[in-house]
């Protein structure tokens, strides 16, 4: 049969599968309601192709050349052109050695970038393949879950809540669907689709469940045709903007240095043309951090792979830097903070109908549950039966209403053995109570039981029933009868409390966002040690009543430990308000209605087993359950970010150091350094610095982000110091006999070739050693670097020392200085290295604002969304609050003598901030009352409460 069908036969010009009756669709596609066979599906797959959009085939060679097309590479390419075009005078041939060296350096950097990005891309593709959209398809007469890519016209598929429609299809018999087509049509509200209507690939099912027949796949779908007509736009991310800013700073620094050299060398000093060009080449070659794009890209690629090994797949690479800066995490309760393994305590079941016992309440709730594709609630209830088959024993299912976030209940219409029609429903107790229109004493009793369950951390599930005398699934039936309440217990994960404590210590405030009752949220928060300062979702409305103590909504959201009774639209509002308060927000989600909040959040996190819609909207997809995966990802992200920040400070420092140092030597002593030797320094530096992507680092104990002020200021200070150290060294070697007198080495006065050798080695050693200073938060000799970085450093400096000792290259104007001078240079470098750490501390201390507190209160270097500079004020406030409420002061995070280091200082501040977060509950009106009650031993039941309950 498959051989008799082709795309030409079913093209819209020949037949409009979107408009013709559904029965004719089956005829045109030569299929039936029994679905296709596996063999027929494979044959049609050969004819119609895979159900996915065409992927652009990227030219590998052009991609390789693309790594040479950026501002930093342009400067190096300009230097290469200068070496053979402008450096052609004074009776000397073009500088072919520098041209070849620069070209090799460019090719090496591009090759490394190309290989690493290609490997990272392949790894990401393999990981994302595991997350490829799947669909329920009827093949060989059996329903099964398959990858959406295998769908062909004629397949029968099942679409349910949370699914992304995998292909264009026509709906068969069933209840209407609510379909979100905003990604395709721009419609803001979901469209209602009935039997016979078409649904488009890429739209999202918001409500309902139905079967459909596929009419178009891949590039032939509505979405595929639209995507084929437009090219995707590449938005410039924050990371790229930072990269550009640092690159521009380095280029401007080099430009200023070259301009000063040109003005002084030619009009004032009347230097030879070729000598001047050589000096300009020194600044160009040595000052450009040509390896920066490569190092940062490789670091992120390797980091992304490590995150995936921990169970967090990054869909967007720059989400790593945002994860490092996250300071608020809004977490789901069910499945993330808890196990999502519900149990029903039969002894606590409450029965409301006179002719019903507890077993019958369980049976009714099991009938209103799915027997396949079950969620956690359905599984727990059906498993209460002796045999799960009892859920459908003796009845004929007529219609099943699946759960949806709006109605928050399921229902089944069925026929019993006597031919009578019945309907039963289970769901959120508030919805079932409203459905049954309970009043008076019955309603009061139901709420008392719900509250009693909630106080013990138990969720409630309402069960109701009705008769359907009209024997029609669409009829309203008799009034609903409230049958009973079931208690559900979802135990917290064993590691949740410890994970939340770790998050607080890392400066990440965890807020519980749950759809359960407020009392359940509070009880769970109490068990997890995350605080009970929680509010109902109604408090998110812009009205200041007694429930919030008149606190503005945005401040309430910031200070709350969580919110209960939350709907998806509330999640979006919570994220928006927190972002307005300058927080970097992470949001977890799993359902289709979580997608807006996941997109709005700085870091959208799709939890394990999330729907396709949630995964599509997220930045990070978890492959393991629980909050610990997220906290581990935060630590890893901060480590990755720390490596990138360490390198950028190093790159800026080296630019300033090369430009200022060699400019002063060239202008003060009219000494012409060899461009080729600067090229050797650059090559050895780049080879060493590549290993920083796998360096050992201590993640920041607080949320971190790009602080350009700190990067530029630290780079300028360290670079200027190293430049002055080089100038002093050159003065001592060129104009004095200091080294000869103190160390017994021969004088180098008038020996320019040997001066180039000693100057080369001095610049090489301290330039590469700088990475140990920028990579550490405390003393560089305290924080052990990675073995790979150490090996690379010593190998590079061994090569540099051998060159300085033995090299006799006339084209580079260098002659070996001997082992004596090499020993002197190493001693000088070690002595002048020590102040680098001190300068680093002074710069950070100055930028932190502590040195200026008398002039500007709490000036900080933090330029992220959140004002972390208020740490000291909050610490003082926290101490005062503890004293007021009779609490002991918090213990210090570190009790050793190394409190001088910035690491321990910042870690201590992080601990204080965590303490502040816990004390916020005491600071609120509600928290204050609870605190006084606990302190004075009052009976809270006898108090007149005027705060959120």
UniProtKB/Swiss-Prot annotation:
Catalytic residues in the record = 332
Top-level taxon in the UniProt lineage: Eukaryota
The answer to whether keyword Translocase applies is yes
Where Mg(2+) binds, per the record, is at 590, 594
User: Where found, per UniProt?
Assistant: Membrane
Tissue specificity here reads: Expressed in guard cells.
Gene Ontology molecular function, alphabetical:
ATP binding; ATP hydrolysis activity; metal ion binding; P-type proton-exporting transporter activity
| Enzyme Commission number | 7.1.2.1
Assembly behavior: Binds to 14-3-3 proteins. The binding is induced by phosphorylation of Thr-948. Binding to 14-3-3 proteins activates the H(+)-ATPase.
- What this protein is called in its record is ATPase 6, plasma membrane-type
Q: Which organism is it from?
A: Arabidopsis thaliana
Which gene produces this protein?
A: AHA6
């Amino acid at each position: 049969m498959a051989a008799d069908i082709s795309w030409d036969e079913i093209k819209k010009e020949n037949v409009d599968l979107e408009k013709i009756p559904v029965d004719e669709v089956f005829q045109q596609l030569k299929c039936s309601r029994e679905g296709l066979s596996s063999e027929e599906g494979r044959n049609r797959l050969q004819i119609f192709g895979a159900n996915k959009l065409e992927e652009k085939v990227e030219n590998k060679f052009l991609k390789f050349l693309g790594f040479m097309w950026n501002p930093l590479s342009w400067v190096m390419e300009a230097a290469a052109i200068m070496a053979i075009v402008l450096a052609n005078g004074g009776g000397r041939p073009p500088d072919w050695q520098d041209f070849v060296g620069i070209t090799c350096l460019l090719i090496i950097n591009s090759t490394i970038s190309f290989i690493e990005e290609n490997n990272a891309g392949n790894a990401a593709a393999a990981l994302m393949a595991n997350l490829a959209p799947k669909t329920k398809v009827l093949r060989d007469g059996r329903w099964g879950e398959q990858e959406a890519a295998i769908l062909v016209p004629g397949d029968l598929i099942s679409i349910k809540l949370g699914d992304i429609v995998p292909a264009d299809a026509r709906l068969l018999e069933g209840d209407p669907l609510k379909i979100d087509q905003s990604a395709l049509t721009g419609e803001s509200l979901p469209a209602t689709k009935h039997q016979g209507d078409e649904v488009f690939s890429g739209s999202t099912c918001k409500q309902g469940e139905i079967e459909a027949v596929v009419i178009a796949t891949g590039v032939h779908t509505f979405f595929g045709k639209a995507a084929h007509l437009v090219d995707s736009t590449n938005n410039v991310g924050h990371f790229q903007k930072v990269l550009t800013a640092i690159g521009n700073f380095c280029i401007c620094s080099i430009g200023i240095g070259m301009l000063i050299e040109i003005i002084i060398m030619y009009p004032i000093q009347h230097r030879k043309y070729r000598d001047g060009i050589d000096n300009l080449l020194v600044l160009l070659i040595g000052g450009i951090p040509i390896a920066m794009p490569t190092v940062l890209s490789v670091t992120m690629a390797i980091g992304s792979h490590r995150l995936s090994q921990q169970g967090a797949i990054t869909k967007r690479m720059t989400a790593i830097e945002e994860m490092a800066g996250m300071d608020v995490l809004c977490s789901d309760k069910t499945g993330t903070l808890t196990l999502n393994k519900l149990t029903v305590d039969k002894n606590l079941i409450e029965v409301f109908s006179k002719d019903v016992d507890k077993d019958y309440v369980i049976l009714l709730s099991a009938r209103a549950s799915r027997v396949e594709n079950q969620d956690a609630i359905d599984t727990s209830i059906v498993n209460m039966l002796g045999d799960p088959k009892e859920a459908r024993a003796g009845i004929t299912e007529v219609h099943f209403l699946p759960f949806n976030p709006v109605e928050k209940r399921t229902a089944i219409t069925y026929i019993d053995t006597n031919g009578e029609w019945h309907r039963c429903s289970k769901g959120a107790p508030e919805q079932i109570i409203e459905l049954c229109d309970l009043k008076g004493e019955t309603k009061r009793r139901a709420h008392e039981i719900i509250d009693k369950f909630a106080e013990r951390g138990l969720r409630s599930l309402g069960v109701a029933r009705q008769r359907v005398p009209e024997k029609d699934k669409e009829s309203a039936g008799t009034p609903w009868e409230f049958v009973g309440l079931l208690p559900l217990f979802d135990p917290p994960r064993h590691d949740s409390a410890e994970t939340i404590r770790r998050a607080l210590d890392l400066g990440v405030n965890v807020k519980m966002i749950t759809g359960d009752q407020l009392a359940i949220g509070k009880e769970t928060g109490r068990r997890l040690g995350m605080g009970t300062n929680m509010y109902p979702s109604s408090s998110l409305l812009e009205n200041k009543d007694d429930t919030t103590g008149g606190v503005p909504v945005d401040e309430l959201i910031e200070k709350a430990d969580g919110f209960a009774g939350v709907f998806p639209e509330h999640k979006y509002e919570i994220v928006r308000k927190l972002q307005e308060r300058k927080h970097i927000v992470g949001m977890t989600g799993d359902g289709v209605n979580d997608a807006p909040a996941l997109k709005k959040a700085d870091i959208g996190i799709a939890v394990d087993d999330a729907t396709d819609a949630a995964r599509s909207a997220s930045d990070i997809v978890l492959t393991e359950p629980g909050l610990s995966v997220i906290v581990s990802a935060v630590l890893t992200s901060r480590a990755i970010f720390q490596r990138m920040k360490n390198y950028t400070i190093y790159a800026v420092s080296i630019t300033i150091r090369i430009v200022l140092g060699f400019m002063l030597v060239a202008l003060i002593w009219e000494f012409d350094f060899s461009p080729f030797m600067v090229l050797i320094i650059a090559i050895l530096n780049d080879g060493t610095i590549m290993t920083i992507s796998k360096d050992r680092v201590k993640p920041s104990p607080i949320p971190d982000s790009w602080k350009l002020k700190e990067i530029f200021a630290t780079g300028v200070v360290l670079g200027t110091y190293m430049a002055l150290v080089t100038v002093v060294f050159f003065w001592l070697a060129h104009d004095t006999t200091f080294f000869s007198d103190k160390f017994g080495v021969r004088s180098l006065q008038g020996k320019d070739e040997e001066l180039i050798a000693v100057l080369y080695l001095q610049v090489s050693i301290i330039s590469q050693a700088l990475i140990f200073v920028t990579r550490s938060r405390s003393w560089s000799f305290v924080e052990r670097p990675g073995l790979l970085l150490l090996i690379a450093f010593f190998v590079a400096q061994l090569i540099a020392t051998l060159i300085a000792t033995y090299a006799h290259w006339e084209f580079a104007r260098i002659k070996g200085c001997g082992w004596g001078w090499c020993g002197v240079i190493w001693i000088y470098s070690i002595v002048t290295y020590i102040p680098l750490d001190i300068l680093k501390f002074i710069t950070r201390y100055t930028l932190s604002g502590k040195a200026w507190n008398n002039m500007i209160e709490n000036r900080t270097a933090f330029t992220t969304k959140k004002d972390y500079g208020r740490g000291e004020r909050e610490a003082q406030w926290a101490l005062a609050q503890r004293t007021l409420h009779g609490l002991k002061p918090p213990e210090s995070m570190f009790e050793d003598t190394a409190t001088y280091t910035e690491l321990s200082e910042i870690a201590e501040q992080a601990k204080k901030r965590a303490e502040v977060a816990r004390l916020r509950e005491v600071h609120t009106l509600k928290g204050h009352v609870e605190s006084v009650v606990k302190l004075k031993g009052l009976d809270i039941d006898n108090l007149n409460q005027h705060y959120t309950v």
